[in-house]
C-alpha cells in the first residue's frame, strides 16, 4: 500500500520505490547476465567501483560474501579518500585491463567525481573503460555522455541511496 506514515510523516512517500524494486529487477536478470558477459569478453581483469555510502556498500558486501567468480574480473570498491588507499588500489590493478564503475545517485557527490577524474586521467582518458550508474538527468549522466562512457545505467529516483541495494546500484 506504500503507506509512508508507517515510517515517518515527512517526505518519505517520495522515497518508497524500493518497495517495488525486486519484481522489476527480476525481469532484468538477462540484462545483468549480458552485462557480465560483455565485460568478460572485453578481457577486463579487474573492476573498480568508485562510490560512497549507499552507492558502494551493497557491491562491497556482495563481493565480500560471494568472492570472485572464476573467469570474471575481480571487484574492488574504492570508497575512501585516503591517498594511501587510493594508491594501494591503483597498484593492485592493471589500469589497462580495468573497468571503472562510477556510482553516484545525484551525480554530484564529490568523492566519486574526484575518483572518476583521477582514474580517467590515469587511464588515458579512455571513456570506453568507464560505466556510470546514476539517476536520470544527473551531472554524472552528462559527463558520461561527454566522455563517451561504455554505458550508463540509471537508478530509480524514488529510491534513496541507502535503499538502493537491489536497484542497478547494487546489481550492476
Which stretches of residues belong to each language-model region?
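Extended, charge-enriched "interface" segments that sit outside catalytic cores
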Residues: 1-41
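Glycine-rich phosphate-binding loops that contact phosphosugars or nucleotide phosphates
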Residues: 34-171
Amino acid at each position: 500500500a506504500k503507506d509512508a506514515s508507517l515510517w515517518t510523516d515527512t517526505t518519505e512517500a517520495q522515497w518508497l520505490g524500493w518497495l517495488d524494486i525486486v519484481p522489476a529487477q527480476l525481469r532484468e536478470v538477462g540484462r545483468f547476465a549480458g552485462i557480465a558477459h560483455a565485460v568478460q569478453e572485453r578481457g577486463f581483469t579487474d573492476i573498480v567501483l568508485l562510490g560512497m555510502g549507499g552507492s558502494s556498500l551493497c557491491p562491497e558486501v556482495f563481493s565480500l560474501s560471494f568472492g570472485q567468480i572464476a573467469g570474471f574480473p575481480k571487484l574492488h570498491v574504492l570508497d575512501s579518500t585516503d591517498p594511501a588507499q587510493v594508491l594501494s588500489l591503483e597498484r593492485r590493478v592493471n589500469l589497462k585491463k580495468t573497468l571503472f564503475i562510477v556510482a553516484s545517485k545525484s551525480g554530484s557527490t564529490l568523492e566519486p567525481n574526484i575518483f572518476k577524474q583521477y582514474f580517467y586521467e590515469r587511464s588515458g582518458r579512455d571513456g570506453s573503460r568507464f560505466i556510470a550508474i546514476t539517476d536520470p538527468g544527473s551531472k554524472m549522466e552528462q559527463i558520461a555522455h561527454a566522455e563517451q562512457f561504455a554505458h550508463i545505467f540509471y537508478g530509480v529516483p524514488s529510491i534513496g541511496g541507502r535503499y538502493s541495494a537491489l536497484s542497478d546500484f547494487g546489481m550492476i
